[in-house]
Each structure stands twice: as structure tokens, then as C-alpha cells.
């Protein structure tokens, strides 16, 4: 099912691709009606939300995924299962190097991103099941390495935004729940509150300069969050720019971080 309001079109809603037909249509119709009338359904519908897909989901990708979904709809689906069909779609500059290092990739809003790294001498392929799989020990080793030493975390998946111009702080204060920073160099963590009072997202906002802010949030939910951003009228003096596709990055983490950077 692909459903929900189209972020780029005001007042335009979708509820399409219901394979089971009438067995789900009543419930999905109710959720759609609540979305239209109240601004949000009573249940979290992100798994069916059309905002999970962006401009990158072209016809070839759509055709491949639809065929795969239909062919596998009655199979047992395992936790953390990743489908290979239609991929890769988008690759970042570090992709080749990460693959060379044994990365097992997942799909995040069209991007290939490393989930974990297979040990040297083993095949970089993930197994699936309801018990501990082959990723458990490598992931455990990564966690211990970060806890006791130092490591690099690819944080390119995060959604990244620049907000600048006269009135930027006032506009952000209306969008998010927390008070945004008023001192240059300061940051704050803040939730984004939905229409029904639930948490629709969480962001880190940093003040880079006078009327200049940098905001980081979930990358896979960027198009989803656009709905909430557009609900608050933005002054013509405030410029809002998505930098998600233009910026990549790594986080240096662990007690020996300073040694690595030094």
C-alpha cells in the first residue's frame, strides 16, 4: 500500500496498491479519512507512507520491487531482512572503499549504506532467521571497539538542513518543541510534535551564526518531515535548504578519539 498526503501538493492524498482488496480497504479507508479530516491518523502508518520514497524511486526500481513483493508476499519474512531487487540505486563516494572492506549494505531512502562489516576471509552476505545470525558477532566486535577504543561511524544517512535569514530562529521555534539556541556554537536536541501530540521526529539544531542554523534529523523521514515544516508559514526572508544529498560525513567516536584526531 502507498498512502498519505503528497508533501509537494497541498490537499492531495493517496491510498493505492491495496493487494488484499476489501480485507484491508476498510481500515485503510478509515486511516485516510482521519488523515484528511484531522491531519493525522490515530496509528503510526509510516510503513505504508508514500513519503518513504523520493525522486530516486524511478520506474525501473518500482517495477522490480513490485514484482518482488508480489512474488514473496506469502513467504516468511525475517527480522532485518533486506531485499536486493532494484539495487543499487544511489551510492556515495565511500561506497567502493566500504565494499572493499567487507561492508554488508542496506537500503536507506535509496542510498546504499553499510550495516556491518564481514570479518576478513568471510563472505559479505547476511543470513536471515529468528535466532542470532552471522552479523551478531561482527556487530558485537564493532560495539566493543567503539566502547574501548575508537572508530568511524558513517553518518551520511542523516537528513541535513540549513535555515538562514531574518526570522530564522522565530520560525524554527514554531516548528519544533524545544527553544532553539540563541548563542553561536550552541546546539539543542528537540522533538518535532505531530498533530495528535505524538513525536513525529527528533532533531539536533546548531546555531552557526546570526539568523543561521544547521539542523540534523532522520534521513529516511526527510520527505515525511517536509509535511510538518510546510504547516508553519515561513517568512520570505527565511531560506530553507536541504543539504542531505550534498553532504556526507563520518563521526569519530570512542575514548581514544582525541588520539586519532591528534
Give the location of each predicted region.
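Active-site donor-binding loop signature of nucleotide-sugar glycosyltransferases
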Residues: 5, 17, 50
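Residues that form or flank phosphate/diphosphate-binding pockets in enzymes
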Residues: 23-24, 224
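Internal hydrophobic alpha-helix adjacent to the cofactor/substrate pocket in enzyme cavities
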Residues: 25-47
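Glycine/proline-enriched, intrinsically flexible loops and inter-domain linkers
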Residues: 43-262
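Short glycine-rich or small-residue beta-strand-to-loop segments that form or flank ligand, phosphate
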Residues: 14-16, 216
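Glycine-rich "substrate-gating" loop/helix at the edge of Rossmann-like oxidoreductase active sites
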Residues: 18-22
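FAD-binding beta-loop-beta segment adjacent to the flavin cofactor pocket
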Residues: 1-14, 24, 137, 141, ...
